[in-house]
């Protein structure tokens, strides 16, 4: 229940009086059965999990509910994955996070107008990140040498940095790594 599996979800689901469904292994049949049997409405997974579902035999996908919300993290979803998820009636959202900032830390905020675009353009837009998750105080792309924001031109490289009360306090018994990671007050 951690890597690319929405560690925030167990708490969110409990807060909403929902039910968590956990599987012992990643298996398309087991996932689809759980969605049908338990009425799963939201789930998280690494790209390989979504790819497994998209490429599963059609017979396994029969009777799936539509409107299931899915999060993908670890890599931008390719056009074929977005298209396959849409064909199953699932809504895929790309998020980014890491253990140190209790992901998801940023989310690709989709726009309704994107629904009218072709799959290639939707995939390009869905690959983007940058809207900070509401629990983060700040997220910004900075030049790590100058600690200044980089131009928002889609070309200039920088590092995404975070501030907020859900950023870790530091690395256990490693003050030097903590100092390096929080240079300038940003993680």
Residue ranges of predicted features:
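Adenylate-forming
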Residues: 2, 29, 33-36, 47-69, ...
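Nucleotide phosphate-binding site architecture
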Residues: 2, 10, 21, 29, ...
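Conserved AMP-binding/adenylation subdomain of ANL enzymes
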Residues: 2-41, 56
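Conserved AMP-binding/adenylate-forming
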Residues: 18, 68-70, 77-95, 99-186
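Helix N-cap/beta->alpha junction signal
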Residues: 24, 46-47, 74, 164
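Short, hinge-like loop/turn segments at secondary-structure boundaries
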Residues: 38-41, 60-64, 109-114
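Short, Asp-centered acidic motifs that coordinate Mg2+ and/or phosphate
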Residues: 41-42, 69
């Amino acid at each position: 229940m951690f890597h690319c599996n929405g560690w925030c979800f167990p708490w969110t689901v409990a807060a909403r009086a929902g039910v968590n469904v956990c599987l012992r292994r990643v298996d398309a049949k087991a996932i689809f059965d759980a969605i049908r049997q338990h009425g799963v409405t939201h789930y998280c997974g690494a790209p390989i999990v979504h790819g497994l579902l998209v490429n599963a035999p059609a017979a396994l996908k029969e009777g799936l509910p539509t409107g299931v919300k899915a999060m993908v993290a670890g890599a931008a979803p390719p056009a074929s994955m977005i298209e396959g998820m849409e064909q199953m009636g699932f809504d895929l959202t790309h998020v980014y996070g890491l253990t140190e900032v209790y992901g998801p830390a940023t989310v690709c905020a989709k726009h309704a107008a994107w629904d009218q675009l072709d799959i290639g353009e939707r995939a390009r837009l869905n690959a983007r990140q940058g809207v900070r998750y509401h629990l983060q105080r700040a997220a910004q792309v900075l030049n790590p040498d100058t600690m200044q924001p980089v131009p928002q031109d889609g070309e200039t490289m920088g590092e995404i940095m975070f501030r907020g009360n859900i950023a870790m306090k530091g690395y256990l018994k490693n003050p030097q790594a903590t100092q390096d990671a929080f240079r300038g007050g940003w993680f």
